[in-house]
Amino acid sequence: YHAENKQVFLGYVIGLDYQNPHLSPFDEFQRFKTHPDIKKIIEGGKRISYGARALIEGGIQSLPQMFMPGALLVGCDAGTLNMPKIKGSHTAMKSGMIAAETIYEHLTKNINLSTYEQKFKESWVYKELYEARNVKPSFSWGLILGILFTGIDQILFRGKLPFTLKHKHADHEALKPADKMPKIDYPKPDNVITFDKTSSVYLTGTIHDDNQPVHLKLKDPDLPIKYTLEKFDEPAQRYCPAGVYEVQEVNSVQKFVINAQNCIHCKTCDIKEPSQNITWVTPEGGGGPKYGN
């Protein structure tokens, strides 16, 4: 996206249902920037900001119950992103407007908050998401078949095919053992077009109070070394875009290290961790990235 003051916003989206545990989304993004068509846009510029976030792109098949006592889920908290367009601001705002109407009716007329979900399904947001519902799951068949099906679904039928594809598995179930997948050799950053995680995290303005409790919880502290490292070559070292997780050797013993102060709260670890051993919880108030641009 081209913005004012000669600024360019550049992003890269990778589905978290990838199979190769050696893959690093951060390094794939760096490699993407070296493509001639991308490089010519950013060459000669200065990197001024960085961020990362897990997107909810499951569509209506992944929508949870959107109401509960005293609260409503709106926007990306619910999952209103239009995956084919990679756009969600408009749907998020509309869901917020519907939520506001529902809350007003609840306070003035004592109407149950559950009406929010019905109002949402009657809105243009749900219609838009419904028409896009089959795009994401179709790519589980592979890139070529996914593109062909999406063309038929979106161009010929405009999202009105008489069936809905299902998501076959959770993202964390997609990883295959490390010894079954090819290793990926990523080039070292040149600090001109490509950069490392440490300097990138600095640009997020991430701040956490010293000595606060670690907000990334391990259900079993021994599992990363005894299971995940052995089977998947500890993919947390790569799927985390902020360098939070490391395997270090201390006194000839391998140790799983959590650099929680680097966390930019993308929540990828909570989603992609194959053992589901990592749980992201809310850090102390005010902690996290502070995007200055």
Where are the language model's segments positioned?
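Extended, hydrophobic alpha-helical segments in both membrane/secreted and soluble proteins
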Residues: 67, 73-80, 89-103, 112, ...
